[in-house]
Amino acid sequence: MPINFQSDSIPPKSIKLLSYNVMGFNGLRLEEGENKILNYLKDSEADIICLQEYNATTDRSLLTQRMIDRALKEYKYKNILNVGEKSSSNKIACYSKYPILSSRVLHYESSYNGSVNYEIKIDQDTVTLINNHLESNKLTKEDKVIYEEMIKSPEADKVKNGLR
């Protein structure tokens, strides 16, 4: 869910940062040769994109790393790392228009979650950026259906009364 803080003016030299749990790019599925999440990222005009639950495949009928790199070609710098104890299945990625000088996984006890520390050169400054994959809120399928209904129809009786 986007969180937007609006201002009448954008400060000079501001940086646009996008953090997104892409949830495996929706199973890497393509619709008419495109992935909606990837299109959103491409159109975001962010300077730096931090992604959690990052994934790609070599199967050309699904979303491949090559497709992602082609869509995000204006980001000259990228870093993709495995995180968590079961690290082969969970990746965190950073795509940046600014040089990524270094990256390191921040280790802590978790099966799937993790964090990566990046040092990014922005003009004359070196900025520390933490890309963090937070613990799941453990919503059930039923909870997710209710949540989607709330977003679509916030005035519905079910939402107002908190009924399942």
Question: Where are these predicted regions, by residue range?
Answer:
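Acidic/histidine-rich helix-loop elements
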Residues: 19-34, 55-58, 138-163
